[in-house]
């Protein structure tokens, strides 16, 4: 007779092979079920689901199908002709109390200076702000997980720490960690053979907050450990909040099962700030750094420095330092001179590949999707934006650009470029205006990385 472990594999294999169950459905639902041999009988198959939502969903949507599959197939447990299927919520796993965790040490990873009160809210980030506040204020997760994504320096880390600080005020156990630190800690415990302590540390908390989630990709052992950490936290209704620079589907090399779990709850994009929000940020940073700038200088910074909040703060400090060194008063002319190098457009000389990647990341598409003509609106817009930025920043002739985008008629390039240019000049689409800034920021980042790499060779 088959062992219980083989029975479980055999039952789940039957489900996976059934044509009525897609691979996505199997991964999202059935792969999480655990067969309970102790409760099962000859005519009843018992399974454990990690949480009530999954339990209810499978019972309602797939209960009849499960009974049909198991009734028609003889498996090692010798199921009767007519089989009843029961799915229950798994009992919560108790973590060994001997792992004496110093939560005070864990709390120090939350930066006290980042709060909801000093987060500048605008139309670009209002949705993210409201979701974050609701998550922080709720005793049980309203959405789980929550994933915020967007370009560098837009306030994602601030909002993550704000959630942590609010949760700590309610005496919740909070773990905030970057994926890099999570990896370092994982390897240390692995080498020391203290994985029980590692699991207790990250799974026995009320809020698990992970920054730079995109860096989990390409590390199979780490992804495996995070997968199980995620599952246990989720099963025990512990709030998970993830931060990434791109949407889950655009994290190349990340396991599909993790991408799937990242999208279980709610995903929201942090957009680049509009001019009004940028000016509010500049004023706030001046106040925090106790620096007084004339109104016209603050407006100049908001208009001419990138959307990266850290760069805006750097510009403020640079003006103040230079004014002190030169014993000069701060005015617009001084600001223009001091900030000249910060206004350099690093997008100049971009490769077509980098432009394609920047557009793809900004619109949550795959590069391969953009290179093929499509009637989908977001793909069509992406192709136009690739043309627009290629004409601005690359020396590529029209013919090679047409070949790059698989266009038979290279005269279409001029039409696509003119269409985007007109849209931007007339300012009829705030969305496209915002996209232009985001794509430029991503190009700057990609080109800066390339420059840094070349200089190190």
UniProtKB/Swiss-Prot annotation:
Entry-linked Gene3D superfamilies: 1.10.1750.10, 1.10.8.60, 3.30.300.180, P-loop containing nucleotide triphosphate hydrolases
Keyword flag Cell membrane: yes
Keyword Transport: no
GO CC term (a single one): plasma membrane
Subcellular location: Cytoplasm; Cell inner membrane
Disulfide bonds: none
Keywords noted in UniProt: ATP-binding, Cell inner membrane, Cell membrane, Cytoplasm, DNA replication, DNA-binding, Lipid-binding, Membrane, Nucleotide-binding
Primary location class: cytoplasm
SMART domains the record matches: AAA, Bac_DnaA_C
Region (Domain I, interacts with DnaA modulators): 1-90
Its biological purpose: Plays an essential role in the initiation and regulation of chromosomal replication. ATP-DnaA binds to the origin of replication (oriC) to initiate formation of the DNA replication initiation complex once per cell cycle. Binds the DnaA box (a 9 base pair repeat at the origin) and separates the double-stranded (ds)DNA. Forms a right-handed helical filament on oriC DNA; dsDNA binds to the exterior of the filament while single-stranded (ss)DNA is stabiized in the filament's interior. The DnaA box is 5'-TTATC[CA]A[CA]A-3' in this bacterium cycle. Multiple discrete DnaA-oriC complexes can be seen as DnaA levels increase. Binding of DnaA to oriC is increased by HobA; some chi-type structures can be seen by electron microscopy. Strand separation requires the DnaA boxes and adjacent DnaA-trio motifs but works equally well with ADP or ATP.
Domain commentary: Domain I is involved in oligomerization and binding regulators, domain II is flexibile and of varying length in different bacteria, domain III forms the AAA+ region, while domain IV binds dsDNA.
Subunit: Oligomerizes as a right-handed, spiral filament on DNA at oriC. Interacts via domain I with HobA. In a crystal with domains I and II of DnaA HobA forms tetramers with DnaA fragments bound at the dimer interface of the tetramer.
Entries under NCBIfam families matching the protein: DnaA
Something else known: Estimated to be present at about 3000 molecules per cell (in strain P1).
Protein's name according to its UniProt entry: Chromosomal replication initiator protein DnaA
Organism of origin: Helicobacter pylori (strain ATCC 700392 / 26695)
Organism lineage: Bacteria, Pseudomonadati, Campylobacterota, Epsilonproteobacteria, Campylobacterales
Gene: dnaA
